[in-house]
Structures are given as structure tokens and as C-alpha cells.
Amino acid sequence: MSQPERFEVLVLGSGTGGKLVAWHMAQSGRRTAVVERQWIGGSCVNVACMPSKNEISSAKVTHLARHAAQYGTVTNSVAVDMATVRRRKREMVDRQIARHLQNYKATGAELIMGSGRFVERKTLEVILNDGGTRVLAADKVFLNVGTHAALPSVAGLDAARPLTHVEALELEYLPPHLVVIGGGYAGLEMAQAYRRFGSDVTIIESGPQLMGREDHDVSQEMRRILSDEGIQVLLEAELLQVRGQSGEKVALVVRTASAERNIDGSDILVAAGRVPNTAGIGLEEAGVRLNSRGYIRVNGRLETSAPDVWALGECAGSSQFTHISEDDFRIIRDNLAGRNRSTRGRLVAYCMFTDPPLAHVGLSEGEAERQGIIARVARLPMNSVLGAQATEQRQGFMKALIGESDDRILGFTMIGAEAGEVMAAVQTAMLARLSYSTLTDTAFAHPTMAEGLSLLFSNVPPRSVQRTTTKVA
């Protein structure tokens, strides 16, 4: 092995948390290198959050155009040009990558494109994408290697060469019948988008409900919305076998509670969970331990089992959202500056960008029940919100959990137009530890979706001397 090049900071993976660490460290005067195998800026910029939301927005325009007559606008027949959809998405991604490259140049962090593997503690061998090898060593190492789509072990599935979100976002044709394996957030977003573009869509979910972590009423409402758009949903459906080739013709054998059934389709999209990118990068040589699921073991400060080595983002088992990876960066940054911040107990918010979207922050009813937390529940259908009535976006509902003893907001869920923006107001109130009555008495602008918060929180049941933990319907 050649003599290593010395850096003060070495980052493996240029995703959200990793790039922010690198730019911060480089701006602080530390010699910093970032090793990235493929996607500058990570999956969010290239093949996940940003491009998928770009495509979802195209699908929403298609949907509105097809229903324009309901709003008094007369259109001729609507056609979808998938090549233009892809070009629009690609141009957006290219702009994001250009901004990233500008940030590397401005901060002085060196971006090295290649595949890295640890050969000893805090020493990385990099096989460069354009040929050659470099060996890098650093005082501090940060791991931000992310995850990739899991492929279920099903006879014939691998041979069928199914799509993941990566390939689905590059299609320039419209699948006649898309079969989505998995009823989680990414699968539902893509299922609705392709249905709106014009595909027949079937969702196969092995569990008893869509979005398994959500409360049953939330899952039921989303299933109703998707079914109303013509998406077929199969629950408690075990995929037994796949024949054929995705992109041509596929036949799937599925076992449901009632019987086995055959599903014929044209394309398969696998959206059945994620696997950490921790194999084959020499973490054992670096002294970095993994948990039983292959994620990097970290403490609340995101420190690994190896001294001066941190992990952040999805590979560290953090919630799989870009904003949580960014928060991981802030925790590491502040702790290196002498503070004592932790990931434990942080308030996690997220959105699913279906139409209408789902937004959630804090505890769900199910989580409160499992944790033995007594909570009061307030619920409001979106049809009761004047802004929803005015715009005829009446699907969904709001729901809040309130502490029994102190009137604090414990959790909030919304399916409805602008759910993410409304949720942000509740999230801010929760961070400030405000009583729910603060929102009850707030004069929200009229007629906005957020105005519904006053109605929602006016429906909070009074405290009771004896109350059992909320049961999930």
C-alpha cells in the first residue's frame, strides 16, 4: 500500500449529512476530502426526494388537466409525453448537481469520485472512477453511505429484473400495467403518479394495511383515496412467484387470505424496504461495528465503536428522511464545538407526497398505546375546513394527540391538501412546548388549510380522572 495522503477530515458518501459535514469542516479551515461512488449530493438529489417530487408534480398536472372540466376549464384530450417528464426532471437534477459542485469549490472540500474501502483504521483506499487508486487517511472520519432498495427473496423476482425507484424515475415509456411490491411511502407515491399518467396499477402489500407504521384510520383513508383513483390494492398478500421480464410481460402468483391468484402486468416496481450500504467497504478493518440488521452502531452522539469515527443518516439507523440526516449533521457539528446534543428523544416529522399528502409529527395513537401513554384524541375531517371546501380539496382529516395531564401536543397527523405546511405549524408549537389551547385561540388567516387547526383543537376532549390509553380502531 502506498503512503496515505493526509487529511484532517474524511467523509465517505456525499449525501445530505456527509456533504454538510464536509462543507462545514472545510470552511473552518480543515483539509477535507469527500469520497463519492456515484451520485454527487447523494440519493435525495439524484434518484429519490427531489426527482420523485418533480415527477409527482407532473402527474398532478396531468390529473388536473383530465379533471379540468370540473373547474370550468374545457380541454381537449390529454396526452402524456414521458420523454418530456424525464427531461424536466433531469434538468432539475442537473441544476442541483451544479449547485453542489459550486459549494465544493467555494468551501475548498475536495470531491473524489470513486469507490472507497477501509484498509485500516481511518485509512481508505479509493478506486477512482476514471482509473487509478488513492489512499487517504484522516484524523476524523464521517460515514454517510446511505441505503439501497431491498429485493425480496421470491422465486423468479430477481430474474425478472424489476424496477426500483432509481430505474422507475428514468422510464421514458408509460407501463401499461405497473405492479408495485410494497405499500410503504415510496411505493404509494410512485403508484399514484403512474396511475395519473395513465398506467393500470396494482399494489401488493404483505401486511394487513398500507403504511404499516401509521394508525389504522390513516391507512384506511389513504387506501380509499387511492382506490377511488382506480388503483387496485391487495393486502395480506404474499408474493409467491414471478415469471417473465419487467418491461415486457410479467405474471405474478400471489396468495391472499381467500385464495391464490394470478396477476398479469407489464412492469414490476419493488418498494419493499431498504438495506444499508455497509457491506464490502471494510468497516471491520476500521473497527466499526454493525447491528444485526447491518446498520452502523452509534450512540446518541452518532459516535461509532471506533474512536474519531462518526456515522450519520440512514446507514446509522436514523429515520430515513433527508431532514433527519441534516439534523444528524447539526448534532455532530455542535458536539464537536463542545455541546452535548443527542439524537435521543428528538421530534421527528415527515411527509408522504401523495395527493393529498400525508404529514405526521410526534406520536401516533398506536405508539402512545404501546408506550403506555394516556392521550386524548381530537379529529377533524377536511370537509369541515373552509379552505378545503373553497378549493374542493376535501379528502382526508386532521388528528391530534394531547397529553392527559399537561395539555401538551404529543402528536399530529394530517391527510389533506398542504398537509406538510400545516404540520409545520404544529411541529413548531410542539417544540415550544405550547398548550394546545394556543392553537385553538390563534387567528389563522382565512380561508387557509391551517385555519382548520383552531377547529381541530377546539374538539379536544376534556381531561378525565380515569382514562385508558387510546385504542387504535
Annotate each PLM feature.
Residues 23, 192, 223-224, 366:
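Alpha-helical segments flanking ligand/cofactor-binding loops in enzyme cores
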